[in-house]
Amino acid sequence: MKTLQSTLLLLLLVPLIKPAPPTQQDSRIIYDYGTDNFEESIFSQDYEDKYLDGKNIKEKETVIIPNEKSLQLQKDEAITPLPPKKENDEMPTCLLCVCLSGSVYCEEVDIDAVPPLPKESAYLYARFNKIKKLTAKDFADIPNLRRLDFTGNLIEDIEDGTFSKLSLLEELSLAENQLLKLPVLPPKLTLFNAKYNKIKSRGIKANAFKKLNNLTFLYLDHNALESVPLNLPESLRVIHLQFNNIASITDDTFCKANDTSYIRDRIEEIRLEGNPIVLGKHPNSFICLKRLPIGSYF
């Protein structure tokens, strides 16, 4: 009987039983959601920390790896030899001599040849040395020369064409040397000095001075000339021929025999003293001159 009562009571209570609300499941869901966000937040923060740490490390320990082109350039720069110095770049002349604004002074330094000159040279003073010869090579690359002075050397020979490229040369002094003949002279000379040499008349070509239309001063004194050079240009003002071996002159030496009206008015001085010639025997040789030559008339 008691068993039957218990069974009936159980049947009455079963419909009233409801499942408990899924609080644990909900809280687990909420927890899971929070965990996911937390893990994502942690991951993000961790990534940013690592990125910042990595950036700091890179900034401190950055190693730049050059590309192939820059490596080759550095290699080329390292192995490319310097260009050899040119002879003129070393400027040996300016160590031995004095170079000032286009002028080179090589006086009394015992040189026996023309030294290499700076290309911009305009004036060379090489007086009182031991130079024996002048060559075309000496001035081949110095086109701006205007004055050359070789007074007091031992020059015996001047190579053909030595002055051929010196189109601007105005003054040339070869005084006090050992010359037997004259070289071909550049066309723009205004002054030529070859006194105190051993030049004879056969050492001067017939037209040596003819085309020198700017020649103003001619010094050939103290040589061995037997006659006055022919075809002297009209531009001459001063002619020094003293102390040679000149024994005679003609009516055409300074004047024009067939033109009695001809006046050579530019000549200011002719010196003929110290020669065997007696000027008084040649009166017609000076009728075109404004001043008589200096010399012996008796």
UniProtKB/Swiss-Prot annotation:
Entry comment on modification after translation: O-glycosylated with a core 1 or possibly core 8 glycan. Contains keratan sulfate.
Tissues in which the UniProt entry reports expression: Bone.
Keyword entries, A-Z: Disulfide bond, Extracellular matrix, Glycoprotein, Growth factor, Leucine-rich repeat, Proteoglycan, Repeat, Secreted, Signal
Glycosylation sites: T80, N88, N214, N258
Keyword Transferase among record annotations: no
Chief site of localization: secreted
Gene name for this UniProt entry: OGN
Coiled coil: none
A GO CC term assigned to this protein in UniProt: collagen-containing extracellular matrix
Cystine crosslinks: C255-C288
Function as written in the Swiss-Prot or TrEMBL entry: Induces bone formation in conjunction with TGF-beta-1 or TGF-beta-2.
SMART domains linked: LRR_TYP
One GO BP: negative regulation of smooth muscle cell proliferation
Organism taxonomic ancestry: Eukaryota, Metazoa, Chordata, Craniata, Vertebrata
Protein name, entry field: Mimecan
Signal peptide residue numbers: 1-20
Family: Belongs to the small leucine-rich proteoglycan (SLRP) family. SLRP class III subfamily.
Pfam families recorded: LRR_8
Each LRR repeat, start to end: 112-131, 132-155, 156-179, 180-199, 200-225, 226-246, 247-277
Superkingdom assignment: Eukaryota
Compartment annotation: Secreted, Extracellular space, Extracellular matrix
Record flagged with keyword Signal: yes
One term of GO molecular function: growth factor activity
